[in-house]
Amino acid sequence: MLINAARLLLPAAALVHLSLAWATSDRCNGYSSTLIQIKHAGDIYKQPSVPGLPPPGVNPYSLIDTLLKNGEDWCKHCASPRVSVDAGRYKAQMDKLLSYAHPYSASSWDSVQSLGDALEHLCKASRKEN
């Protein structure tokens, strides 16, 4: 029973960690909220009762796409550390993440924490050179 409770707390702890890291403004709270929606939508998708049917009005892939497309703003205002990114480098790095041939690629996004780690990496890898 204790092990099951710990399993339930790990995703919650990851969400709290990300929420605290990004809770510096309404903008960052919006990104944090989007990640929570992605997590919730992913949980719904995994329910065995209705295999293959997405929940009405919620698409985690659409939310991830929106998050990535606004990632330059996220990097500048919410990432740790906050960085300005080069738009071309950001696009190239984002394409790598979505290519499934990268250590932080979409194929490894099995939790909100791993998605957050990928976003942090994306910001660092596309940072503007001075």
Swiss-Prot record:
Disruption phenotype: Greatly attenuates U.virens virulence to rice.
Subcellular location: Secreted; Host cell; Host periplasm
Induction, per UniProt: Expression is up-regulated during U.virens plant infection.
Predominant cellular place of this UniProt entry's protein: secreted
Keywords: Host periplasm, Secreted, Signal, Virulence
A GO term from the CC aspect: host cell
Annotated stretches, region: Plant immunity suppression domain: 68-85
Domain of life (superkingdom): Eukaryota
Protein name: Secreted cysteine-rich effector 2
Organism: Ustilaginoidea virens
Gene name for this UniProt entry: SCRE2
